[in-house]
From Swiss-Prot:
The keyword Transcription regulation does not apply. Ca(2+) 1 binds at residues 34, 36, 38, 40, 45. Ca(2+) 2 binds at residues 70, 72, 74, 76, 81. This is Calcyphosin. Ca(2+) 3 binds at residues 106, 108, 110, 117. Monomer. Does not form oligomers in the presence of calcium. It comes from Bos taurus. Calcium-binding protein. May play a role in cellular signaling events (Potential).
Length: 189
């Protein structure tokens, strides 16, 4: 393990100390920082973002992380590659079941899950807020998607956003068998 790997472990531990959604929250935050939509951050943006989140890296660690994910020598790091590396690693069995659950939800096969995709696999009719008249079934479906969606809450969930969410859940479960059983039951796979 080199210095950057050690730094990523340190960052990952700091994220996971925030709970199962720690990685997801960091991913949302950094995607929001990417104001120009370039899917990259420079050292200053990364440092400011980490500081705002209360995640601490020294200058050498920050520079090492940026060098590792600066794919084109532009002085910026590839945001998605960085976030993928930040996620706690999942075994092949865990990755496969997360991908299978996403594929089940993505009924249109276009790589994103929308409210329309959910209608066939998730019913909000029995949700307490629908039964009380407080929400519509559409609102329940949107709220459900928002659990996985990025900070933009655009009503579309990508596989990366779905993985961000489940990487945090995965980190809290000791065995592949336990995680796979939970996913299989939750998504009726």
């Amino acid at each position: 393990m080199d210095a950057v790997d050690t730094t990523m472990e340190k960052l990952r531990a700091q994220c996971l100390s925030r709970g199962a959604s720690g990685i997801q929250g960091v991913a949302r935050f950094f995607r929001r920082l990417d104001q120009d939509g370039s899917r990259s951050l420079d050292v200053r943006e990364l440092q400011r973002g980490l500081a705002e989140l209360g995640l601490v890296l020294d200058t050498a660690e920050m520079e090492g992380v940026c060098r590792r994910w600066d794919r084109d020598g532009s002085g910026t790091l590839d945001l998605e590659e960085f976030l993928r590396a930040l996620r706690p690693p999942m075994s092949q069995a865990r990755e496969a079941v997360v991908t299978a659950a996403f594929a089940k939800l993505d009924r249109s096969g276009d790589g994103v899950v929308t409210v329309d995709d959910l209608r066939g696999v998730y019913s909000g009719r029995t949700h307490p807020k629908v039964r009380s008249g407080e929400w519509t079934e559409e609102q329940v479906l949107r709220h459900f998607l928002d659990n996985f969606d990025s900070s933009e809450k655009d009503g579309q969930v990508t596989l990366a956003e779905f993985q961000d969410y489940y990487s945090g859940v995965s980190a809290s479960m000791d065995t592949d068998e336990e995680f796979v059983a939970m996913m299989t039951s939750a998504w009726r796979l």
